[in-house]
Amino acid sequence: KAKWVEGIYKNIWIDQFRKMSKLAYNEGTLITSLFEHARELQIELGCPIEKTMVTPNGIRVENLQNIPGKTEEDEGKINIGAVLRVTPIKDVKTMIQAFGFAKEKDDRLKLWIMGPWEEDREYAEECFQLVSDMEIPDVVFTGRINIRDYLGRMDVTILTSISEGQPLTILESYAAHKPVIATDVGNCYG
């Protein structure tokens, strides 16, 4: 159903996916999904309803209670946090471009891109270069972090993924009482 997949290979891939799904559904004793809509899609693809079950992601809410808040460095800033892997599926380039436009409207904005970038170094370098080419101030790539050290400093979190299941970053943001801006993919709508 992905509209962004183009070319002659799309139908071949869909056919192979359906075959693999049927095999897994026939041989499996329990088929789990992260959220209800994914379960419905599995049933649509031929999984017997009695084999399906929703097992949502979970986090330890207590680990994100009483976390450190804003620092002196944050004075006068509106911190926007993105907790993610810097990879194409997270569409970090769109996030950077959108931030660039928003920054022109409100100079208080600061974007924190928090998470590893080593998985796809070429894409990460393209993201770094985009920030440089657009001459956007106040974009920070932290690399891998302990979420407790940063999440309390954020005013809002953002996720621009083109595909998701049930993102932990959204659950963590809610646990820390932070609002979320997210693309409408997977279970990002709640």
Task: Kindly give the residue locations of the regions a language model identified.
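Glycosyltransferase donor-sugar binding loop
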Residues: 83, 110-125, 141
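Nucleotide-activated donor-binding/catalytic signature segment of Leloir-type glycosyltransferases, i.e.
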Residues: 124-144
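Short hydrophobic beta-strand element within catalytic cores of glycosyltransferases
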Residues: 179-182
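Carbohydrate-associated surface elements
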Residues: 37, 58
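Conserved donor-binding/catalytic core segment of Leloir-type glycosyltransferases
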Residues: 32, 73-90, 96-99, 103, ...
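Aromatic "clamp/platform" in nucleotide-sugar-dependent glycosyltransferases that forms part
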Residues: 162
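Membrane-proximal helix-turn-helix segments that form the acceptor-binding/catalytic region
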Residues: 11-31
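Short alpha-helical donor nucleotide-sugar binding micro-motif in glycosyltransferases
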Residues: 144-145, 149-154
